[in-house]
Amino acid sequence: LNQKLKKDREKLKQSVEESENAIDELLIMSKYIEEEFYSINPSILHDIQKYHAEAWEILEKHKWTFVLNGIEKNIFRGIKEGIYHNDFDPTIIAKLYVGKCDLIMGGEIFEYPEHKLDRVFKDAISFHIRGLVNSKGLNYLQKRLKNA
């Protein structure tokens, strides 16, 4: 588990380095996470939580430190670059993002196999990005998605 999380951290740090701006960074990170979700059956997460408390604690710590900090930094970056709205608290939005991931992975609302995690995450991140970007960012996002 620690090796997997280390690999994830390295991949997400790489996305920051390779990205042109905060939108690209979030798109690269999201694509990676979406691909990871594609292979996860939510019952596995439930089993980890129920039967492997130590592993679950590691996952929770990773989510509420590394992921939260990464999203918060992304929001500050987007505001600084002038492509995200600047009229909200980045910490609140980052916590909402992590909470949304919990909701997606929980399996109570988006039951598997009716709702595939990768599809739910893709829709959630699309909604998240569109809520972050201002008009300049939206223009960039639309061009970026059109050329993807």
Per-range role (PLM):
Residues 8, 36-41, 74, 78, ...:
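A short secondary-structure junction motif
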Residues 10-43, 94-97:
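Hydrophobic alpha-helical connector segments
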Residues 23-24, 62, 80-96, 114-119, ...:
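All-alpha amphipathic helical-bundle segments outside canonical DNA-binding/catalytic cores
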Residues 31-34, 53, 64, 98, ...:
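Amphipathic alpha-helical core segments of compact helical bundles
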Residues 35-72, 80-92:
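Short secondary-structure transition hinges
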Residues 73-77, 81, 114-148:
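C-terminal peripheral helix-coil segments that are non-catalytic and often amphipathic
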